[in-house]
Design a protein with these regions (language model features):
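Post-DEXD/H (motif II) to motif III coupling segment of the RecA-like Helicase ATP-binding lobe
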Residues: 213-279, 450
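Conserved pre-motif I regulatory segment
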Residues: 48-55, 73-77, 81-123
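Inter-Walker segment of RecA-like/P-loop motor cores
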Residues: 164-199
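Conserved helicase ATPase core of P-loop NTP-dependent helicases/translocases
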Residues: 157, 170-182, 329-333, 341-342, ...
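Walker A/P-loop
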Residues: 116-139, 381
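Conserved interdomain hinge at the start of the Helicase C-terminal
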Residues: 289-335, 341-346
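Conserved RecA-like P-loop NTPase helicase motor core
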Residues: 356-453
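Conserved Walker A/P-loop ATP-binding site and its immediately adjacent core
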Residues: 131-165, 243, 335-338
Length: 460
């Protein structure tokens, strides 16, 4: 029999207090997950650690962002604890409407839900107007100290321009490697977060995290989104949430529960995104068993980067597109720099550019401008820097040459090509059904990711 049970809620951590030790132990085990590769750890081998990360400790303490999940699990066993909320939250907010901008219904509903719930991971596909949602939240809460975290300077710059030039908001500051402008509302890359600790760590009431899935694994990035002890408004934004338990619980614990805004297929059906035709090229197995004793890196180098047959297929696709289209805009994404340079040399076409992380922002914008403005068909080759944060609506064809497994990487890359533009009614996507060790399972995963989003998939 339970004599007492209540949850004390604070900004960063909350605590379940009860005399039912069995219940606490059950939650301790339920919120425990094995860390990948734990069996190789010295601590595990010496029996000093069981290989688990725990999100609910033996004293009943857990991250407040997991409160909704904990309450749901308690309800399953007919437990309804009293809630003691120790937070001091200013629930007043200003109007979130932006001048000369009309929200889609799902955008306005998301802003309203964020202001009501105060802690949410907003799952919104590429092209759904995530930055517009951020703008509405910032305007509504603009009288508070606020931090918006980014993992890339390019995303920060785009958001700064939107908030200041489109939304006409004031008191907006920026902080990144070589730049600093103070503002009560501070846009900051996680790499430069140390520069705002004195001014914003203790007083920030609102924390927003762009591309928040990028923050839930690294020690520094996770520590950043778990900080800010007075930030009772906490919002993350991503197109794809983590599927593995540890990063998923890291993210929810620091921010809050996931709220799905709308699906990509919904946006396509409503005419807000371009319909993709995904074509999977069925490649023959070319390793003849030589891949069996190779590591992943060796397989990738041999059968992706240096694979002449596969690379020549990409060249043939590009040539075929150019023959059939006068002004095609072809995006090719690679995982490695060497692969990008190999394809650049192989294609050797005019109006072709290769972008990498080392390129400055001005170099990137110049390359994108050339890509857009070419009178004939043009090709843009890039690495991960083109996966997120770059809006090139003119893309008509997308070749995913990376052979990656990740759902996040696959769908974010696809999202680059789906934005609407007057020059296209559909976008053609090319990917590969590779067969070699590791690559075969990764190809099947990508196919599954495409189908999960209800896209049309054709095998060539």
């Amino acid at each position: 029999m339970i004599v007492y049970m209540h949850i004390e809620i604070n900004t960063q951590n909350s605590t379940l207090r009860t005399d039912n030790a069995e219940l606490v132990n059950a939650l301790y085990e339920l919120y425990s997950f094995k860390v990948q590769g734990y069996q190789y750890s010295r601590a595990y081998k010496s029996h000093r650690w069981d290989g688990s990360k725990r999100f609910f400790n033996r004293k009943g303490v857990f991250r407040t962002g997991l409160l909704t999940r904990v309450l749901s699990d308690l309800k399953k066993v007919d437990c309804s604890p009293d809630l003691v909320d120790n937070r001091t939250v200013n629930t007043n907010h200003s109007d979130y409407q932006l001048d000369n901008i009309t929200y889609y219904p799902y955008q306005e509903e998301t802003i309203q839900k964020c202001l009501q719930e105060k802690r949410l991971v907003v799952k919104a596909p590429t092209g759904s107007g995530k930055t517009l949602i951020i703008g509405g939240i910032v305007k509504a809460l603009r009288d508070r100290k606020m931090v918006i975290l980014f993992n890339a300077k390019q995303l920060l710059n785009q958001t700064y321009e939107f908030l200041t030039e489109v939304c006409n908001l004031e008191n907006i500051g920026v902080c990144f490697g070589e730049g600093y402008i103070y503002g009560d509302i501070m846009l900051c890359t996680v790499q430069s977060i140390d520069k705002i600790l004195d001014t914003h760590l203790e007083d920030t009431e609102v924390l927003l995290v762009d591309e928040c899935h990028e923050f839930c694994n690294g020690k520094t990035t996770l520590a950043a989104i778990e900080s800010f002890p007075k930030a009772n408004y906490r919002f993350g934004f991503t197109a794809t949430t983590p599927s593995n338990s540890i990063p998923k619980y890291n993210l929810e614990g620091a921010i809050g529960p996931v709220h799905s805004v709308v699906t990509t297929s919904d946006l396509v059906e409503d005419g807000k995104l371009t319909k993709p035709i995904i074509q999977l090229i069925d490649r023959p197995y070319s390793a003849s068993g030589a891949d069996e004793d190779m590591s992943y890196l060796e397989v990738y180098e041999e059968y992706i980067v240096k694979n002449e047959e596969r690379n020549n297929t990409i060249k043939e696709i590009v040539n075929d597109i150019k023959e059939k289209n006068k002004r095609a805009r072809i995006l090719i994404l690679t995982k490695s720099l060497d692969h990008g340079r190999t394809l650049e040399n192989l294609l050797g076409v005019e109006c072709s550019s290769f972008l990498e992380g080392a390129d400055s922002l001005s170099e990137r914008y110049q390359a994108i401008s050339r890509f857009r403005g070419c009178r004939d068909s043009s090709v843009l080759i890039g690495t991960k820097i083109l996966q997120t944060g770059i809006n090139i609506e003119e893309i008509t064809h997308f070749i995913n040459a990376r052979a990656m497994k990740s759902e996040i990487a696959t769908l974010q890359a696809l999202g680059r090509a789906l934005r609407k533009h007057e020059t296209k009614e559909r976008v053609f996507v090319y990917d590969f059904l590779d067969k070699e060790k590791y690559l075969g399972s990764h190809a099947r995963e990508r196919r599954k990711h495409y189908k999960k989003e209800k896209h049309e998939v054709v095998i060539l």
